[in-house]
């Protein structure tokens, strides 16, 4: 009997692993959801989900936790993607936070993130009773994410205890949870930032235009270039936006996301820039610098 063997490239191996994880969760859990933050990792994760269930649609909705401070380009891209693929998109906003006027300028990055992202996410998970939530986090991004399992177990309050996680042997995942508990699932755990960009290029995946370099209005604060995306951003005395060619390596709330000066306006240019980069993509995320161990503390409280 002749048997055909296949030598998969490392990207195809990562793709196969991620699709396996997505299908496992769809089969094991009653009410899964895919967190869609509109960034490059979300774009790849959604692409993998579409592949996993082609020609059908993914058997779970997308959930976007809208802080009301995302870049305008992100919101228009989100709506375009949902319409293009006919996806079930849930947009959740913490209305109590909106009533209180919570924002990054008035309440600071830590409180804004807690109320409009962490608490809002937990509200949505409780409201729709999701028992598994896909996220696009990768282990190479940040040290607390480096020690997180693919199946990351959360208690009834959505809190993460890094000392109380289950072993994962090879590709065997234990999805049993008690009533009220849930898991966060990270199909891209073993991908790197470079893998993401190479896959986007090879698969021709649409991404938010903010990832490409263009001349944009920015101000420099504490060594970080912040894009002036709308008229809600208060300018300091004597501060004037500068027009610079910039792009973003990571996306979030616009007042809390730093741009980098760049001329890379094509995917090959971005990949070339990535190969020469010596800093983390999250260097521009203000929320990661709120305090030492900031990301781990947020995850313990229920953040993704």
Swiss-Prot record:
Keywords: ATP-binding, Nucleotide-binding, Nucleotidyltransferase, Transferase. GO terms for biological process: hydrogen sulfide biosynthetic process; sulfate assimilation. It comes from the Bacteria. Its EC number is 2.7.7.4. It catalyses: sulfate + ATP + H(+) = adenosine 5'-phosphosulfate + diphosphate. Pathway: Sulfur metabolism; hydrogen sulfide biosynthesis; sulfite from sulfate: step 1/3. It holds the Pfam family PAPS_reduct. Gene3D superfamilies: HUPs (3.40.50.620). SUPFAM superfamilies: Adenine nucleotide alpha hydrolases-like (SSF52402). The keyword Nucleotidyltransferase applies. Disulfide bonds: none annotated. One of its GO terms (molecular function) is ATP binding. InterPro entries: PAPS_reduct_dom, Rossmann-like_a/b/a_fold, SO4_adenylTrfase_ssu, Sulfate_adenylyltrnsfr_sub2. The keyword Hydrolase does not apply. With CysN forms the ATP sulfurylase (ATPS) that catalyzes the adenylation of sulfate producing adenosine 5'-phosphosulfate (APS) and diphosphate, the first enzymatic step in sulfur assimilation pathway. APS synthesis involves the formation of a high-energy phosphoric-sulfuric acid anhydride bond driven by GTP hydrolysis by CysN coupled to ATP hydrolysis by CysD. PANTHER family: SULFATE ADENYLYLTRANSFERASE SUBUNIT 2 (PTHR43196:SF1). Heterodimer composed of CysD, the smaller subunit, and CysN. Belongs to the PAPS reductase family. CysD subfamily. This is Sulfate adenylyltransferase subunit 2 2. The gene is cysD2.
């Amino acid at each position: 009997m002749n048997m055909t063997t296949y030598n998969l490239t490392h990207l195809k191996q990562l793709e196969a692993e991620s699709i396996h994880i997505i299908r496992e969760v769809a089969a094991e859990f009653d009410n899964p959801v895919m967190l869609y933050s509109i960034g490059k990792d979300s774009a790849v994760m959604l692409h993998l989900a579409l592949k996993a269930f082609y020609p059908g649609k993914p058997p779970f909705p997308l959930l976007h936790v809208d802080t009301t401070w995302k870049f305008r380009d992100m919101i228009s891209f989100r709506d375009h993607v949902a319409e293009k693929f006919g996806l079930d998109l849930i947009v959740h906003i913490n209305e109590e936070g909106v009533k209180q006027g919570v924002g990054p300028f008035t309440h600071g990055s830590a409180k804004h993130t807690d109320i409009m992202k962490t608490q809002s996410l937990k509200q949505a998970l409780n409201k729709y009773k999701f028992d598994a939530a896909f996220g696009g986090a990768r282990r190479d991004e940040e040290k607390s994410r480096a020690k997180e399992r693919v199946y990351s177990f959360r208690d009834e309050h959505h809190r993460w205890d890094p000392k109380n996680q289950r072993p994962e042997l090879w590709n065997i995942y234990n999805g049993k949870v008690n009533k009220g508990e849930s898991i966060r699932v990270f199909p891209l755990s073993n991908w790197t930032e470079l893998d993401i960009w190479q896959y986007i290029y090879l698969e021709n995946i649409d991404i938010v235009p903010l990832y490409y370099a263009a001349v944009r209005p920015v101000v420099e604060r504490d060594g970080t270039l912040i894009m002036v995306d709308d008229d809600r951003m208060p300018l300091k005395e004597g501060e004037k936006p500068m027009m610079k060619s910039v792009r973003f390596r990571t996306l979030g709330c616009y007042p809390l996301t730093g741009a980098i000066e760049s001329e890379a306006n094509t995917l090959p240019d971005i990949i070339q820039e990535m190969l020469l980069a010596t800093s983390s993509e999250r260097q521009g995320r203000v929320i990661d610098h709120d305090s030492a161990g900031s990301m781990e503390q947020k995850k313990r409280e229920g953040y993704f």
